[in-house]
């Protein structure tokens, strides 16, 4: 499949053939599995204290005796804490068990649980190829919410030469992505408790820019535009190509990065 090739002035200078990675069958199930695996690698372990709900001085004899026993009292044989007493007469309540007030939880989350999900190497590569193939389907790109009416992905020659945020914005405007930029610049304040849990604002995902080599100035310039991401072509993953496990992200890739995909046979 051929797509238009643009220069830094957003003028079409020819066509370019997409590498075989873009011809993969789109597997939504594999993409989701790879995405969830990446998300699990970021999950922080959590759990209750091992002694939570077990710190009361509560004990009841299970034998037939006269002192502190539950036999012959018409009460269940559970651990009990004495709140007050008069001789051998106790006012005591159940403690240290799941059904009791101030008791432990029956099956609390364990801090030692391993949340890390593994995925086969070939399966991960298949997911990346599937996500790349989805970027050339205009219907999937529009279904993600991107506003574009030209063939995708967008291939730009010399993309690595840009250094300033203003230059990147001008290129995107010349490529006809003015409405797309307006969409990602609109940031909404989240409804609900997420506001006080470190995710107060909802940020839309815009285009993904893929380059051949790392350049600090270029990467910082892209970071200044909300919703945009940038990555080197060997470091691509499903989370970047299909945020939320939904494939079809708008892809802007440099010509050199496309040739690197072809020559190095990445993700095969």
Swiss-Prot record:
Keywords, ordered alphabetically: Ribonucleoprotein, Ribosomal protein, RNA-binding, rRNA-binding
An annotated Gene Ontology molecular function: structural constituent of ribosome
InterPro entries listed in its UniProt record: Ribosomal_uL4, Ribosomal_uL4_dom_sf, Ribosomal_uL4_euk/arc_CS, Ribosomal_uL4_euk/arch, Ribosomall_uL4-arc
Disulphide bonds in the chain: none
PROSITE patterns according to UniProt: RIBOSOMAL_L1E
Origin: domain of life: Archaea
Gene Ontology cellular component annotations, sorted alphabetically: ribonucleoprotein complex; ribosome
Gene Ontology biological process: translation
A Pfam family: Ribosomal_L4
Assembly and binders: Part of the 50S ribosomal subunit.
Function summary: One of the primary rRNA binding proteins, this protein initially binds near the 5'-end of the 23S rRNA. It is important during the early stages of 50S assembly. It makes multiple contacts with different domains of the 23S rRNA in the assembled 50S subunit and ribosome. Forms part of the polypeptide exit tunnel.
PANTHER family registered for this protein in UniProt: 60S RIBOSOMAL PROTEIN L4
HAMAP family the UniProt entry points to: Ribosomal_uL4_A
Family: Belongs to the universal ribosomal protein uL4 family.
NCBIfam families for the chain: rpl4p_arch
Name recorded for this polypeptide: Large ribosomal subunit protein uL4
Organism: Nanoarchaeum equitans (strain Kin4-M)
Lineage, broadest ranks: Archaea, Nanobdellota, Candidatus Nanoarchaeia, Nanoarchaeales, Nanoarchaeaceae
